Structure formats: C-alpha cells, structure tokens
From Swiss-Prot:
Residues 20-34 have a biased composition (Pro residues). It comes from Zea mays (Maize). Residues 53-62, 150-159, 182-205 have a biased composition (Acidic residues). This is UDP-N-acetylmuramoyl-L-alanyl-D-glutamate--2,6-diaminopimelate ligase MurE homolog, chloroplastic. Residues 1-59 form a transit peptide. The keyword Transmembrane helix does not apply. Residues 118-132 have a biased composition (Basic and acidic residues).
C-alpha cells in the first residue's frame, strides 16, 4: 500500500451511556382474544426465602459439673452400647420387616417391645390402615428360614456378633427388588395417564423443558414429525396432476426444492433448470417422490418410487408444503410487514410488543428466525420468501408452543406475487415504498403488485387488520387492497389525521424520545433506537398494538425493551464520549438517508467509513464517495468484500466521486499532507478495512459520530477466494479500548498521517 504507514497498532471497541428509565407500570388487562385463545406465557416463579441470620445461633455451654468432658461422655455411651449389643438378636422386631413382625404384611406394634416408642407405634398403625385401604402395597415377605442358603447357616457359627447383625441386614436387602432405569421410565409413562401421579405428558411423550414452559432463553426446541402418503397429500392439496406414476402409497416426511437439503423420505419439487440439475442428487439423498412440470424418465435411472406431473409447478410449490405441514399459520396469529425501509426494525419491535403482552411470539426475518424469546432456529435469511422454509419453520414454532409469528416481507429477493399465499396472515403492515428500476430489477408496477399481494388477503373485517403509513404516497393504494370493510389503522410522523402520530420528539446521540398520540391515550416512549427513520418503525409498532387492542403499557414496555437492531443504525457503546454507529447501508440512497439521519442527531462532526464491493456495480462507486464527502466532515474510503478485484482499483473508481485519481492521492501522501476537499471536508483512504475502521474510531472526539457503513450485521470479508471472519462491530469495540490511551499520549488522530506532538 502506498499510503503513509501507521506507526502504531490500532485496536478497538466502544459504547455510549444509555439513560436509565424506570419501567412503566404493568396494565393487567389481557390482550384482545383472537381466533384462538392466546395462551399467555408463564411468568418465572419467584419464591420468597427469608434472609439468613447475621450470626450463627450460640452454642450451648458445656456441662462439666459431673467432672466428665464431652469426649468422656461419648466414650462411655459407646461402651454401654457395645455391652448391650450381644443382647440384640435378629429375632427382635426392630430388625424385622413389617411383614414378618406382624404377620399381616402391613406392619404391627408389639406393646411389650421396649424398642418401640410412640413414633414407631403411630407409623405402624398408619401403615396397617393404609394397607387395609389398599393405598399402599404390603411389604414383600422375607423368605422362611428353611429357604436360606445352607452355607449361610454354617457361616453364622463362625461369625462374630457384629458380623451376624451385618449378615442379617444383607438377608433383608436380598428381599428388595432392583429397579432399573428402564423400569423407572415405564412407570413414568404409565403414571403419565394418572393426573394424580404428576404432570401429564405431551403427545409425543416428552415434556417441555422448564425453561421452555416459562418462555425463557435456552429452551430445547422440539422438531415435529410429519407423515403423509403421496395420495393423501394430493387429495389434501386439491391439486389435479396431469399424470401420476409409481407408488402413490409411498410415505412422505417432508418437502424440498433444494436438492442439497433433501433428506430420506422427502418429496422433491423440481423447479426450473436448477431442479432438473439437482434431480440426481435429490435421489441419492433419499427423495422418494418427485413433482415436476414435465415428463421425466425415472424408471431405471432413479430410485424414487413415484413421479407427479403438474401444469403449474409454482402452485405445487406453495400448496404441497402447506398441506404436508398441516397449515400451521391457521393456528397462530400471523403479522406480515412489507416495505422498502424499516421492515427489519419494525418486525423486531412488533415481536417485542407481543411478548410484552405475554404472547409467545416467533419471528422470521433476514437477521434470524426465532421460535420465541431469544430461541433461535436454523434458517436462511430469505426464509420468509421461501414457501417451503416458511411453512416448516412455522410448523416447528407451533409445535413448540408459539402463538404468534411476525414475518418480514422485504423487497430484497421478493418472490413472485402469491408464492406465499398459503400463509394465513392476520395483519398487514406497510412501512414505505421507495423504488428504483436499477436497484430492484423490476418495474414500478411489478414492485407494487408484489407488495400489495399481502394486503389483498385482508378480507375478513372480524379478524384482519391493515396498518399503513399515510406519509407515503402509495398508502391509499395499499389501503384499498382486499376487503373495503376491513379496519385500517394509519400512522404518520406529523399528519394529525392519522390514528397514530407524533406529538413531540427529541433526537440525541444516545437515545430517542417521542410522545405518541393514539386513539386510547398518549404514550411516552424512550428508545435506544436512533434517528427519525426509527421513529417511523416505533409508530408502526404502536399502530399494530392499537389494531389488536394491546394494553398501552405493554406497547411502551415492548418497544423500550429493544435497545438495538443488529447492523441497523446500531450504537456501539463502550462509554466513550462520542458516538459510534454501524449500519448496513450499501446503496447511494441508503447511505444518503443514513447520513441525513445522523446529522439530525446534532453531532459536532461526522466521520464516515464507506467501501464498495468488488466485481460488481462499478457505476455506484463514485456516487457513494460523492454522497459521503458531501454529508460527512471526514470520509475514510476502504474495501468491502473486494473478492478477486484489486482494492486499489476499487478505490480509484471511488476517488472519481471527488475529482481525484489514485495517482494524485498518492502524490499528496508523499508530501505527508492530504489537502481538504473544496467544501472543506477531509478525505482519506486505506485499502485494509480493519485499519480504516479502527483509524476512523480513533479520530472520534467528544460530540462526534463515527459511522461505519456497508456490512452492518454481516460477519465476513471476502478477499480473493477466502471468506474470513470480520465484524465491524467487534473492530469498533476493540478500537475503543485504546482510544483513551492514544489521546493521553498526545497523539493527534484527527487526520492522516497520525502525528506525535513534537511533529506539529
């Protein structure tokens, strides 16, 4: 690298003090009932335990008036016991089992026996009573002396009195049955049918973990098992195949369209050229049947047992998994959130609000899939756009007790309209619509049609609800989709005609405070989510809460529970005096909105790190630099997944955004000085992203905001053929550990190259 080398190692992390706020009081009113009664998650049990005493109880004073110490008293007691020991025989009732002592099998009491006291008498009488009533089983009788082993009788004469007593105890123990682990399991299963013997078992013979019952983290996720014959599946799905060959009674355990995911017993849906190419692999992995839209020769070439030919393979793709997995969305509340921006944040806030109401809520989105709480499921980021993955994930959630699911219906990789029409949505939410043909590869009409498919299913006024942002010009179009008598809840930043709107708000580097007007009262919300765009997500969540009749206190509590969305204007807080934000903005539009939002926070300076990916989208590189240079006080250009392209070539393209070339920049570096841009802002570059991120964080001073863009929550860097771990957030945290040391050393980190005080 031709830039001036750094004279020291740059490490980093960091964070901002978040204002503490008292939790709002809980409203005890339950949420409005839905189609099916919502089972409220159990709250963690709290048991009162009295505090332990500060001091141990005083020890009784030793009584030595008789001239004997405690040790002497103990020695005398032992000696007396040894003297009496020969008088104790195995025939004494004290050493006999209840059956032999009384002959009744239920235990008895001998009034002439000096070894029984009042407690022994009560126990024996109760045992006899319970035995007569059949509440307990009689103790097994000891074998008669005649059945004892002859060798044991011969040994008795040779044993000491102590050994005789031990032998008698051994004989008693021989009458006990040894219970194996398998026997205990059998008894537990039998006892599961009797409600008096314990908690009832669930249908698959396994009880929920305690953590799972309480809705806590770490609960064990149980995988449901499905089984249906091909004939039953075709009948249930109402598909009319063109032809069916092979065994229609073959049992199916799952559905897949990706050959690499096929497991034994699966039905393989052969879609397009990729499906045909993966047919052999699916067969080797154990696919037992194939669905295709063209005739295939499976006899003699494939081991699968059946072939179904259909006219519309996409219809089969969405209907078959829904039927095989028993249409799980019919038994849960499903909230779909669509739009261009703010979709991810809104889904997380809605999930948190439902859980604040006590509803076990799952989420399917690009940042992860959760069954409920923080219990994550293994799923691809595009799972909500995959009809097979979505149905299977929802079936798993339902099997684990999930009552509501929030689905993220973003525009990235959006599927054709209607591909998820087998999901029974209850609420449709629109954030906003921003469309560019170049970014989405779709016309405006196609783009709108795909998003509107969610709202077109809102037809039942008793169950469905529409939630729209009326600040967006497309809001009337979406509100008109589906049934016209379905209630519509509107929200707006400033429009007072909306059902939910802001009355007052305050933005800062560390939190957002907003006063929200609703039809049922005013909400005061303090959130760790930064910027104006996140206020829209908060308003959308409040509108969903109003639509379902959620208690206002639960709405506030749920929203305030979410401190950050990974990689979405995420604040890195290590208690430093300046802000550090990590965001996934990687397009000119997203970068512009992000920096505008950061400027609204009122920072002293904005220091921005921006990079562009290799091997694609060369046209946007100078545009990204131009936006960053115009809206930031300091810009640090760097690489972002350069792949097989030279990072210096990428940076050369980016420098064109400010009218520089790489040759000019290197010439400045040779003179140890980089001049300001025409607007007075500064620009530096470093081809190593780790150095660029850490250097930018080290430039931060009190009141500044350092913005790291491009990766967000992504945790990898692609260089050449290597895909290595890299996390902007961890780099920032590591860097922040050393910022104070650099500043105390007097090093000027405000610009490149860094200088020691004597070099000024």
């Amino acid at each position: 690298m031709a830039t001036a080398p750094l004279a020291f190692r740059l490490p980093f992390p960091f964070s901002f003090p978040s204002a503490s706020r008292p939790p709002p009081s809980r409203i005890l009113a339950p949420p409005t009932p839905r189609r099916l009664p919502l089972r409220l998650a159990a709250a963690a049990a709290r048991r009162f335990r009295p505090p332990t005493a500060d001091d141990e109880p005083p020890e009784a004073a030793e009584d030595s008036s008789h001239g004997l110490t405690r040790y002497d008293q103990l020695a005398r007691s032992v000696e007396r016991a040894r003297i009496r020991q020969p008088e104790i025989t195995p025939d004494n009732p004290l050493f006999s089992s209840p059956s032999t002592a009384g002959g009744g099998g239920g235990g008895s009491y001998d009034p002439d026996d000096e070894f029984f006291d009042e407690i022994d008498r009560a126990i024996a009488e109760k045992r006899e009573e319970f035995t007569r009533r059949g509440l307990i089983k009689p103790s097994p009788a000891s074998p008669p002396p005649s059945q004892s082993q002859p060798e044991d009788e011969d040994l008795t004469d040779e044993l000491s009195p102590e050994e005789v007593i031990d032998l008698d105890e051994i004989r008693k123990l021989q009458g006990l049955s040894v219970v194996s682990v398998a026997d205990e399991e059998d008894e537990e299963v039998e006892g599961g049918e009797d409600e008096d013997d314990g908690l009832p078992l669930d249908e698959d013979g396994e009880g929920f973990d305690v953590a799972e019952e309480l809705g806590l983290e770490g609960a064990r996720m149980r995988q449901p098992a499905f089984r249906m014959t091909l004939a039953e599946l075709l009948d249930e799905s109402k598909l009319v195949p063109v032809a069916v060959t092979g065994d229609q009674d073959v049992a199916l355990a799952g559905v897949q369209r990706d050959a690499s995911l096929v497991a034994a017993g699966d039905l393989f849906v052969c879609v397009g050229e990729d499906g045909l190419a993966g047919l052999t692999e699916a067969d080797k992995r154990g696919a037992v049947a194939v669905v295709a839209d063209q005739d295939l020769n499976i006899e003699g070439t494939l081991a699968c047992r059946a072939l179904v030919i259909v006219d519309d393979i996409l219809t089969a793709l969405r209907v078959l998994p829904a039927c095989l997995y028993s249409r799980p969305s019919m038994n849960m509340a499903i909230i779909g959130v669509t739009g261009t921006d703010g979709v991810t944040t809104t889904t997380h806030l809605v999930k948190a609000m439902y859980e604040a109401m006590g509803v076990r809520t799952g989420l399917v989105g690009v940042l992860g899939t959760y069954a409920f709480s923080s219990n994550k499921l293994d799923a691809r980021p595009d799972a909500s756009s995959d009809p097979i993955a979505a149905q299977k994930l929802m079936a798993t959630m339902l099997h684990n007790g999930t009552e509501a699911v929030v689905l993220e219906k973003g525009t990235d990789g959006m599927p054709p309209s209607g591909v998820d029409s087998e999901i029974d949505y209850d609420i449709a939410v629109l954030t906003n619509v921003r469309h560019t043909d170049e970014e989405n590869g779709m016309t405006y009409e196609e783009y709108m049609s795909r998003m509107a498919s969610l709202f077109s299913r809102m037809v039942d006024p008793e169950r469905h609800r529409k939630v729209v942002n009326i600040d967006d010009p497309s809001a009337p179009f979406f509100a008109a989709q589906g049934g016209h008598d379905v209630p519509v809840v509107t929200y707006s930043f400033e429009n007072k005609k909306a059902d939910v709107h802001t009355l007052k708000y305050q933005l800062s580097l560390f939190e957002t405070e907003v006063l929200v007007q609703t039809p049922h009262g005013i909400l005061e919300i303090s959130s760790g989510l930064l910027g104006r765009d996140n206020i829209y997500s908060i308003l959308a969540t409040v509108a969903v809460g109003i639509a379902v009749g959620a208690p206002l206190e639960d709405i506030v509590r749920g929203i305030e529970e979410v401190d950050a969305i990974p990689g979405r204007c995420e604040l890195i807080d290590e208690e430093q005096a300046f802000g550090v934000i990590v965001d996934h903005a990687r397009t000119p539009e997203a970068l512009s909105r992000l920096l505008d939002g950061v400027r609204e926070l009122g920072p002293r300076r904005i220091v921005t790190v921006v990079g562009c990916c290799g091997e694609k989208e060369r046209g946007k590189r100078p545009v990204m630099t131009k936006i960053a240079a115009d809206k930031s006080d300091v810009v640090m250009l760097t690489s972002d997944n350069p792949a097989n392209e030279d990072p210096l070539d990428i940076l050369d393209d980016m420098l064109a955004g400010v009218g520089w070339t790489m040759e000019e920049y290197l010439k400045y570096g040779a003179n140890d000085y980089y001049p300001p841009l025409p607007n007075g802002h500064r620009l530096f570059l470093h081809d190593i992203r780790r150095v660029a991120v850490r250097a930018a964080v080290a430039m931060g001073e009190q009141g500044d905001v350092v913005v790291i863009t491009g990766k967000g929550n992504d945790t990898y860097q692609i260089e050449g053929d290597k895909n290595e771990f890299f996390d902007d957030r961890e780099e920032c945290r590591e860097a922040l550990q050393y910022v104070d040391q650099l500043h105390r050393a007097g090093i000027d980190t405000s610009e490149f190259p860094w200088r020691l005080p004597e070099s000024h």
